[in-house]
C-alpha cells in the first residue's frame, strides 16, 4: 500500500494530499530511510513522522483499503513519541 494512502486510512494524517506534502518535505521515514508518498508500506515496517515539534514512531500492524474511525488505531502501534526543540 502507498505511504500516503496508509497515513490517510489509518488517520495518522487527515488527508492524503497533506500526507503527500509531508512526505515530499522529507518529514517521513520508513525503517530509517527517507520516504516518498508513493513508497510501499508493509506490516512490520517502522514509520517515523515529524509533526511540527513532535516526532512519532509507529509500527504498521495491518493494511486495509478502508476502515471505520474506531478501528483505525488498530492499523498501527505507537512505539515512541518525543518532543523536539525543548
Swiss-Prot record:
It comes from Bacillus subtilis (strain 168). One of its GO terms (molecular function) is tRNA binding. This is RQC P-site tRNA stabilizing factor. The keyword Magnesium does not apply. The lineage of its organism: Bacteria, Bacillati, Bacillota, Bacilli, Bacillales. Keywords: Protein biosynthesis, RNA-binding, rRNA-binding, tRNA-binding. Disruption phenotype: Not essential; synthetic growth defects can be seen in double rqcP-ssrA mutants. Double rqcH-rqcP deletion strains grow normally in rich media. Loss of Ala tailing, RqcH is still recruited to the 50S ribosomal subunit. In vivo mild decrease in tRNA(Ala)-binding by RqcH. GO terms for cellular component: RQC complex. Residues 1-62 form the S4 RNA-binding domain.
Amino acid at each position: 500500500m502507498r505511504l500516503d494512502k496508509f497515513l490517510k486510512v489509518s488517520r495518522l494524517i487527515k488527508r492524503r494530499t497533506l500526507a503527500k506534502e509531508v512526505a515530499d518535505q522529507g518529514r517521513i521515514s520508513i525503517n530509517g530511510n527517507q520516504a516518498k508518498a508513493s513508497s510501499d508500506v508493509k506490516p512490520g515496517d517502522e514509520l517515523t513522522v515529524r509533526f511540527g515539534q513532535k516526532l512519532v514512531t509507529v509500527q504498521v500492524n495491518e493494511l486495509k483499503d478502508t476502515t471505520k474511525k474506531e478501528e483505525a488505531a488498530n492499523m498501527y502501534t505507537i512505539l515512541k513519541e518525543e518532543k523536539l526543540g525543548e
